[in-house]
A protein has these predicted regions:
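A short beta-strand motif characteristic of beta-propeller blades
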Residues: 1-2, 37-43, 80-87, 123-130, ...
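Beta-rich, blade/repeat-based domains predominating
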Residues: 3-13, 45-56, 87-100, 130-145, ...
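Short loop/turn segments immediately following the C-termini of beta-strands
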Residues: 21-23, 64-66, 108-110, 153-154, ...
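Structural signal for beta-propeller blades
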Residues: 24-28, 67-69, 111-113, 156-158, ...
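Short loop/turn segments immediately following beta-strands, especially the blade-tip
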Residues: 31-34, 72-78, 117-121, 161-168, ...
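Loop-centered beta-sheet repeat module
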Residues: 103-156
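Blade-level signature of beta-propeller repeat domains, shared across WD40, Kelch, NHL, RCC1
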Residues: 248-252, 266-282
Length: 282
């Protein structure tokens, strides 16, 4: 079995959800893990999605170039298209975050985060606007959805918003890099620990991993090399004792030990060869 353009992957039960392209069209495919066969695919986009995530039997994808968000449902191991949210060509849609009955979509090239109401046919209900060349990329909520933490790609900044329903109030903004060091750099992934005490962020070009403490108020407590070049994505292990980062330009995955008490990265413990890796899941 071969799947072209498999940039992003997620797992639902015994099924892999994989982005794919075929005959100049792109979309997603469902692959049975046991039999290694393609169960179904829908190819409606002109370029491959850059993000895929599932919640229960619903799948959400974001397309950077097409500027669309696609919503699917898995029904009897087949894909059913629920909604295509068309934002704008080259909007830079980079993620879909679930919040109550809303979808939150960072639109990197529009310098906006757009919020859509699931219960009202995915209508646009809120837009957060950022200064030009900020490039909001990925965000995470804390456990009770009272704070939304966002990383920007173009300006390499961290944003902390207080959240009350659809009111997003900016509390803190941190520069991950000095302004004169932004050339040829771009921040990428963001993760939060289960106890909501620490944030981790990767920055390409500078090849950095940044640790932010959320206690009292957000502050940077550590920045170290990612163990390779172009750290596009990373994850925390289930027990949060390790951080695994994929470095695309050096074709490797670096594994770091974490100190759960202070959130800091202790040391690099292993590096494995992984060709052209751009995403990672457990």
């Amino acid at each position: 079995m071969s799947i072209d353009d498999a940039k992003c992957v997620d797992r639902y039960e015994n099924i892999l959800i994989i982005t794919t392209s075929k005959n100049n069209k792109s979309g997603i495919a469902l692959v049975d893990i046991s039999t290694k066969t393609i169960l179904d695919e829908i190819l409606l986009e002109n370029s491959s999605p850059c993000f895929v995530k599932h919640h229960d039997d619903f799948i959400y994808t974001a397309n950077y170039h097409d500027g669309v968000v696609m919503v699917y449902q898995i029904v009897n191991n087949k894909l059913k298209l629920i909604k295509q949210i068309s934002i704008q060509n080259k909007a830079g849609c980079h993620q879909v975050v679930l919040y109550k009955n809303y979808l939150i979509v960072p639109c990197l090239l529009l310098d906006q985060v757009r919020i859509f109401d699931i219960n009202n046919d995915y209508d646009l209900v809120k837009t957060l606007t950022f200064p030009a060349k900020t490039g909001p990329r990925h965000g995470v909520f804390n456990h009770d959805y009272s704070h939304f933490y966002l990383v920007s790609e173009l300006s390499s900044e961290f944003f902390d918003f207080s959240v009350d329903n659809l009111e997003f109030t900016l509390n803190t903004k941190l520069n991950l890099l000095p302004k004169d060091k932004l050339d040829n750099t771009s921040s990428a992934a963001i993760r939060i620990t289960k106890d909501n005490r620490f944030i981790y962020i990767s920055t390409r070009g500078a090849d950095l991993l940044t640790v932010i403490s959320l206690e009292n108020e957000p502050k940077i407590i550590q920045q170290i090399n990612s163990g390779g070049m172009h750290p596009r994505d990373f994850i925390l292990s289930e027990d949060e004792q390790y951080l695994l980062v994929v470095n695309k330009d050096t074709d490797d995955m670096s594994s770091f030990q974490l100190d759960k008490t202070n959130g800091k990265i202790v040391k690099l413990i292993n590096t494995d060869k992984v060709p052209h890796a751009i995403g990672i899941i457990l």
